Design a protein with these regions (language model features):
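Carbohydrate-active catalytic/glycan-binding domains of CAZyme proteins
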Residues: 1-378
Length: 378
């Protein structure tokens, strides 16, 4: 048995996506304009995590110059299929939706395959069907005309893995569970016991955030919603609850019939969320063909046990605060704004130390200043 303590990734690790290869689990998160981008983590017990790299680790993969601080890289999805890892995400500043691939999750990852104007919207995901075909699932504005802010829909289209281009016709499959839904986003598709399930967030990534689910026997048709939607939210607990904004989930199983979901949430302090949106884990069971998140509890737990052998790492993201400056590479937890390769630091001017080189830009400005930071955890 292993004890899971939430959040499993403390600090600014929003929009988590998870996949499994054998007994190994991998999580990726949004990174916006911070560089390198899209941190990737590894675990063997879902409780203890080590950072194994940053997927977008060179400027050619991460063109975010001039972007607003909350633009850049949105909501990545990670999947493993037939010997290859796929990460798909949105660069809302340059190029929009793209895919990178790797045989090893530690890298190197490929140059981006941009999907172009054929893939509008944000929060893309990939689904691999039983026949090996791959499908793109994303969000886009209501094509009949946006009636209100957040009037979007979820759509799918086949992806040719040889050309990395969308083929065939796209189809809208869902607009959200709640009447007048805003921001149906973060969609993920799974095939379980003969049904295609669509898990997604709605309500906006704030007080009304939630997780909803729909299903269908066929991929290219309108999905039916779960009668219990939203299947998970903290909106009913109030803004004084210790954990708020819960939503944006991704399911994973352990290969033995046990299911879990990762999601984002925030821990407020004096009405502010200084650590941003963090990554949490919850148990999932299935009843009458629908997922139940945090069964018997109904909210994110501070800690719980799961039937899995414990596996610890030398330096875990959950408890290690020490950063060294020995060697030729920066600690992978450190991030710059926009670009970390343009001479803002040195690790060789003084042995075992970091030297920063000033720029004329101020940190109070929205500019590419001389800056290296690490995510606050508590």
């Amino acid at each position: 048995m292993v004890t899971v303590k939430n959040p499993i990734l403390m600090g600014f690790y929003p929009d988590p996506s998870i996949c499994r290869k054998g007994e190994d689990y991998y999580i990726v998160n949004s990174s916006f304009v911070y560089a390198p981008g899209v941190p990737i983590f590894h675990s063997r017990d879902l409780a203890h995590w080590e950072q194994i790299g940053n997927i977008l680790d060179r400027p050619s993969q991460l063109p975010v110059a001039g972007a607003d601080i909350s633009d850049g890289i949105y909501a990545p999805t990670i999947r493993y299929h037939d010997g290859l890892f796929y990460m798909i995400t949105t660069n809302v500043t340059h190029g929009n939706n793209f895919i990178v691939t790797a045989e090893n999750p530690e890298g190197p990852w490929s140059e981006p395959y941009y999907l172009g104007d054929d893939a509008p919207g944000i929060d893309p995901s990939l689904f691999f069907d039983d026949d090996g075909k791959c499908y793109y699932c994303g969000t886009r504005p209501n094509p009949e005309g946006v009636r209100y802010n957040g009037d979007w829909e979820i759509w799918i289209q086949e992806l040719d893995l040889k050309t990395m281009k969308l083929v065939g016709e796209s189809m809208a499959i869902w607009k959200g569970a709640v009447k007048g839904c805003i921001w149906p986003e973060g969609p993920h598709i799974y095939k379980i016991d003969g049904y295609y399930y669509l898990l997604h967030a709605e309500g906006g990534t704030g007080p009304e955030h939630s997780i909803t689910v729909a299903r269908s026997k066929k991929l290219f048709q309108w999905f039916e919603g779960c009668p219990r939607n939203p299947i998970f939210t903290h909106r009913n607990l109030g803004m004084d609850y210790p954990v708020i904004y819960a939503g944006h989930g991704d399911l994973v199983d352990d290969g033995k019939g046990n299911w879990y979901v990762v999601m984002l949430a925030s821990r407020p302090c004096k009405k502010h969320s200084s650590m941003g949106r963090e990554t949490f884990l919850a148990r999932v069971i299935w009843e009458n063909g629908w997922p139940v998140i945090a069964p018997g509890v109904g909210h994110l737990e501070d800690e719980f046990t799961i039937d899995m052998p414990e596996h610890r790492f030398a330096e875990e993201i959950t408890n290690s605060d020490v950063i060294h400056f020995w060697g030729e590479q920066l600690d992978q937890r450190l991030v710059a704004i926009e670009d970390w390769t343009s001479g803002i630091y040195s690790l060789t001017e003084r042995e075992g130390a970091l030297r920063m080189y000033l720029r004329k830009e101020k940190i109070s400005e929205r500019a590419n200043c001389a800056y290296l930071g690490v995510r606050q955890k508590s």
